[in-house]
Amino acid sequence: MWVLYLPAVLSVLIVTLYLYFTRTFNYWKKRNVRGPEPTVFFGNLKDSTLRKKNIGIVMEEIYNQFPYEKVVGMYRMTTPCLLVRDFHVIKHIMIKDFEAFRDRGVEFSKEGLGQNLFHADGETWRALRNRFTPIFTSGKLKNMFYLMHEGADNFIDHVSKECEKKQEFEVHSLLQTYTMSTISSCAFGVSYNSISDKVQTLEIVDKIISEPSYAIELDYMYPKLLAKLNLSIIPTPVQHFFKSLVDNIISQRNGKPAGRNDFMDLILELRQMGEVTSNKYLDGVTSLEITDEVICAQAFVFYVAGYETSATTMSYLIYQLSLNQDVQNKLIAEVDEAIKASDGKVTYDTVKEMKYLNKVFDETLRMYSIVEPLQRKATRDYQIPGTDVVIEKDTMVLISPRGIHYDPKYYDNPKQFNPDRFDAEEVGKRHPCAYLPFGLGQRNCIGMRFGRLQSLLCITKILSKFRIEPSKNTDRNLQVEPRRVTIGPKGGIRVNIVPRKIVS
């Protein structure tokens, strides 16, 4: 008899689930904020949740759908959030009214690696930022430059040997060997040769941290749930690996700086200075002891930021040089002249002072901003200036750098690679919010100077010895890998690397 009731039960269940997973979908309509129509369960993230498109591409598409709106109401799964398009509003959120949007809002267990500068919020973030910002000053990076230089020389030797066997390279994986070497040396004081037995482990770590976990979608649907359950988005094997690595290094150095001027030395110097404190009036006084766990968390985020983002940016830069030989010719001429002026050496100042190289780098980041989207959480109710729209406390605010960087209102022919966009005169004409590869304001990327320096050094070294040419397998229409957390090339990037003395 119960079989007769089964259709009715299923119907009730389906209707109940439908109502539950659409219960918030009138949120923005009630506030007269336009936005794309959400899909049951997925909200506006169906393609990224199913790993059909990268989240950065999805955000760009939503940005483009509403060219005349200052803000766009959307849904991450069932949770309402706001995509901001207007520069005036972006500037208020990121700079002028920073205290109302100081948190990134990525909420999960802050035990282990979770207590890192990127994911920390509130006064914990402020305390970490105040203490760790000096690590990335120009002076500190200059002292660390010799470590990068050693890694770059070893990398060029490796490429030279490989060029004796072949011309075509998949440059993304190739450049990861350079950034792995540099980060291992600059962060942990470990030479690449001595960690060759750990390369396989590092590759596993890279795969895990470069591909999104569905824990992210769970956080979208049920904000704060991961934190309440004390769950982390960082897998346990990754946490164990970095804890073991950092513990061994601290033990080898007896908990004291070893005179290498690397990241670990600088952190151990900070620990000798005592607790990290913050006395911002909003939250009273917060003290944070620099424990081994805190050190491990910062080393983790330093590795992730410097390893993957730099390798990907350089890969895209080399890709564009292969397709734009006129740009490459001009850049090689600048590199040759700069090295000649430095008595045949590549110094810190050599790299920093090459204007065209820096413009090429900036244009690469315009076309391929690696971290998408930028995210902030409202710490209080906030009325958007000049509107009746109120962003309620705990609402996520998103910004699409890629959407902005490809907007023809700000960049003519945005799909064309043109480093001259970054002539000083051209930059002066644009709003500062028109270029956001590293974010903006106090929560911009603290390691951007390091990433930029190691990348510019490597490109300089490469072009001093080689030319980049398209190969028969160079994809003229690169797609973005949908499964990665960051923007990255689907299927890699294949080009020919040719010693300059035998240019074809």
Curated annotation (Swiss-Prot):
Membrane topology term: Peripheral membrane protein
Entry's localization field: Endoplasmic reticulum membrane; Microsome membrane
Induction: By treatment with the monoterpene, alpha-pinene.
Gene: CYP6B7
Pfam families noted in UniProt: p450
Reported cofactor(s): heme
Name of the protein in its database record: Cytochrome P450 6B7
Known catalytic reactions: an organic molecule + reduced [NADPH--hemoprotein reductase] + O2 = an alcohol + oxidized [NADPH--hemoprotein reductase] + H2O + H(+)
GO CC annotation: endoplasmic reticulum membrane
InterPro entries named in the record: Cyt_P450, Cyt_P450_CS, Cyt_P450_E_grp-I, Cyt_P450_sf, Insect_CytP450_Detox
Cysteine-cysteine disulfides: none
Binding-site list for heme: 445
Classification of source organism: Eukaryota, Metazoa, Ecdysozoa, Arthropoda, Hexapoda
Family: Belongs to the cytochrome P450 family.
Keyword ATP-binding: no
Keywords: Endoplasmic reticulum, Heme, Iron, Membrane, Metal-binding, Microsome, Monooxygenase, Oxidoreductase
Enzyme Commission code(s) on record: 1.14.14.1
Keyword Endoplasmic reticulum: yes
PANTHER family listed in its UniProt record: CYTOCHROME P450 (PTHR24292), CYTOCHROME P450 6A16, ISOFORM B-RELATED (PTHR24292:SF100)
Listed GO MF terms: heme binding; iron ion binding; oxidoreductase activity, acting on paired donors, with incorporation or reduction of molecular oxygen, reduced flavin or flavoprotein as one donor, and incorporation of one atom of oxygen
